[in-house]
Amino acid sequence: MDDYHVNTAFSMGRGNQQDDGNSESNSMHTQPSTMAPATLRMMGKSPQQQQQQNTPLMPPADIKYANNGNSHQAEQKERQVELEGKSRENAPKPNTTSQSRVSSSQGMPKQFHRKSLGDWEFVETVGAGSMGKVKLAKHRYTNEVCAVKIVNRATKAFLHKEQMLPPPKNEQDVLERQKKLEKEISRDKRTIREASLGQILYHPHICRLFEMCTLSNHFYMLFEYVSGGQLLDYIIQHGSIREHQARKFARGIASALIYLHANNIVHRDLKIENIMISDSSEIKIIDFGLSNIYDSRKQLHTFCGSLYFAAPELLKANPYTGPEVDVWSFGVVLFVLVCGKVPFDDENSSVLHEKIKQGKVEYPQHLSIEVISLLSKMLVVDPKRRATLKQVVEHHWMVRGFNGPPPSYLPKRVPLTIEMLDINVLKEMYRLEFIDDVEETRSVLVSIITDPTYVLLSRQYWTLAAKMNAESSDNGNAPNITESFEDPTRAYHPMISIYYLTSEMLDRKHAKIRNQQQRQSHENIEKLSEIPESVKQRDVEVNTTAMKSEPEATLATKDTSVPFTPKNSDGTEPPLHVLIPPRLAMPEQAHTSPTSRKSSDNQRREMEYALSPTPQGNDYQQFRVPSTTGDPSEKAKFGNIFRKLSQRRKKTIEQTSVNSNNSINKPVQKTHSRAVSDFVPGFAKPSYDSNYTMNEPVKTNDSRGGNKGDFPALPADAENMVEKQREKQIEEDIMKLHDINKQNNEVAKGSGREAYAAQKFEGSDDDENHPLPPLNVAKGRKLHPSARAKSVGHARRESLKYMRPPMPSSAYPQQELIDTGFLESSDDNKSDSLGNVTSQTNDSVSVHSVNAHINSPSVEKELTDEEILQEASRAPAGSMPSIDFPRSLFLKGFFSVQTTSSKPLPIVRYKIMFVLRKMNIEFKEVKGGFVCMQRFSSNNVAAKREGTPRSIMPLSHHESIRRQGSNKYSPSSPLTTNSIHQRKTSITETYGDDKHSGTSLENIHQQGDGSEGMTTTEKEPIKFEIHIVKVRIVGLAGVHFKKISGNTWLYKELASSILKELKL
């Protein structure tokens, strides 16, 4: 496979950039046989061009032609491009350098976009930011899913650009370029530090980084995939959340911060955008790009982070220790959770700075006194008076409803001694670039360990440990000795903490290898003993005359009197528990989140045991489901609820049907009413068919242990009966909507959503269709904004009753569905540009024109519900992929009244498209929803800055507090004076050593005032998705937003505006 040339000798920050360029230019003759040969252009320069260079530089950005494997055509194209380049060199040169750049850019070939990384195939882009993009990847053999973060190698890109520039004119120009080069080198160091820290951290609320690959132009980091989305999406759905749910999220964040601070690590960029939610509603902290290692005896001087979540000492450019900055950011995050907005906000950045420095917070009336008490202790301007993390986790609001503070999940550690120092751990620290020299680091560790203070703390540790072990021997709990004195195993020194983390990572890897070896040997023993065991079983059971399969017939020739077990009437043996390995029993390449949708409860129990706050003997192992996990009926018990809520049955049906009578290799039997239900797919049709009925699902064989043969088989003409019943149901729905529209005309405008639902279901005898009585609440107390969600109940169960024509199997071929949480807009293979809307594919339809009728609603005239349903009933199957292929989703507490609707899905689809057109938002309808993009021209941006509040035009999530190393360095995109107040409110520092800087945010702010001549360029567009999902339990249609790229807080306001316009 033709690929980038991989420079295995590359090492960032070791002063060998020049050797790197020479090694790449000569490596085509010394390349290993396992690597694909790189072409001359992929190597950067041809030999003739390389000889003309006076100073060796790194090669330019690698490129590759889309030749579909035809290397001969690629070589011809390269020769042709080289000849064109030579002809341009011989041609007379223009007077201006700009014209030469334009001519050279026109001759540049198309840039290569990678589609895979080893065995991982890129599926789609799920996020983008200033540092790079995140792609979803699927393993081609194991079908595991992971998130691949792709970051440009800043130094390589900078040196490539330098080649295109004229040589420096004077010494000052040389110094300026050298400063820029050092800044790019520090960016690469920051990326490598993020990867190194991510590999050694191991916590259930921290997104795991499994591997990092360094290629010629990019860093590829393989993270576990958290499919639940960002916490920001959760807040958009609700505006704000209830305190008991916010407490659960806050305890997860606090647990992760305890673990980080106990290992001398400070995050420094904690914000809503960097917190993800898994399918089990557990949080995961991501993005350690700005994290650093702190020492409690010293202070940091790097001022970084996002403005809205940055502590006042960062804005004042005061030095800090580290943990207090995370406590402030934690307080802002908690405020956003319970209030739905940031505590400090203003359209003028100068006023916003002053508000943050003053720290005056206004709390909404619906907040409890306890949470206000906690927030008032965290959002304190003076870091010395601010609550510590220990005080936060022990606050009565944080422990309400729980047995105590959140656990830290730190494994059991003991104080180090000289004899315990392992050279292999030091070498691993060197490989991860935490240290520069192994022997020097060992000397530093020895000096720390032999220090009298550390020796005294170690003796106290063992004394108190022995005492508390004796006291806790009755209940078996581990001693908690951190409250009595300073624990030498927690945040004593950063070098010791990194040694602990690296050692624990190696222990986990070694334990995993041992488990794999033991499993393989155990499986081999089982295979060898399989034949005699089966013979013994047949000696005890029934006759062999009922045997039909070949393996049993072969065994029957040895002993004709062997009885046969009556459990499987078709005669097949169930050796699956021996031959098929467990789902998580795979190599180190398994990168699926342990809280993903496919995981079972057994996996979660083992993960909780592995990462329990009480140290266990096997804390360093990576746990997985063993090959024999007990009775398979136990799996069916905890799997039933998930099979009801989603239609993804797949392997679960196979596993549970193996042990049921007359069910092996046979379709699931269904009653006549089951035939029109959407819970079990009929025949070979896809399970995502858009046929919505409210029939109660019948328990199948895979969800019950008994009553296997109670239901009769389907008749031969079942499909025709189903089609007739569907057509009849459609006619009834249309007639019913006639009556509904007549009734709605008589309802007052201010009657509210519940009155509307009551009118729709008036005359029904079912009590659950009537709206619930209003809540009895005292008038002196304001309700939480989401409290009205409890009043709907089952009164709005109408949207799933409308049925679209069935999808023919030929229109969309059936394939294995991978629910990644994102829509199938496979545009990554065509272009990585955010501004390009790709052409029509099999899974999507092109952007709709304004003049279309039902498929693209016109802004001038809005159709009535009756007209929409009539058009939808006549529309061919597959013409509305957003509702023809809906998703079944139910995340606990994820949907509210504002994001759910009782109306039929065609009406929901039409309203979404109508609002998008009305708001001039580009969109593309795909399976399950819409991919949308909001562009901002310079006029729109200027108008928004003048007329919109600060909350609508906030800073981007990547426009963080940054310290400029030089006043002469201008940003890549020039801005107006007002925009510099908003975009350059921070101090970015190169992510290297923390050195004191006299540059403060005020100085940066003054620098922005002097740039009167700058003009505004087009703002980065916002790309997001709108999912149309089926909320099964309550029988409603839901709308779910997911951000892909762009300004985070502007996206939040845009999504909120869309929800208000929808009026679901």
Curated annotation (Swiss-Prot):
Keyword Acyltransferase: no
Segments of skewed composition (Basic residues): 779-794
Domain Protein kinase residues, every copy: 120-398
GO cellular component, one term: plasma membrane
GO molecular function per UniProt: ATP binding; protein kinase activity; protein serine kinase activity; protein serine/threonine kinase activity
GO-annotated biological processes: exocytosis; positive regulation of exocytosis; positive regulation of IRE1-mediated unfolded protein response
Bias type Basic and acidic residues, positions: 74-91, 598-608
Predominant location category: cytoplasm
Membrane-topology annotation of the record: Peripheral membrane protein
Active site: D269 (proton acceptor)
Membrane-spanning intervals of the chain: none
Posttranslational modification: Autophosphorylated.
Domain KA1: 1015-1064
Any Pfam family: KA1
Region of interest (Disordered), ranges: 1-113, 549-621, 652-672, 694-714, 762-797, 823-843, 958-1016
Similarity field: Belongs to the protein kinase superfamily. CAMK Ser/Thr protein kinase family. NIM1 subfamily.
Protein name: Serine/threonine protein kinase KIN1
Record lineage: Eukaryota, Fungi, Dikarya, Ascomycota, Saccharomycotina
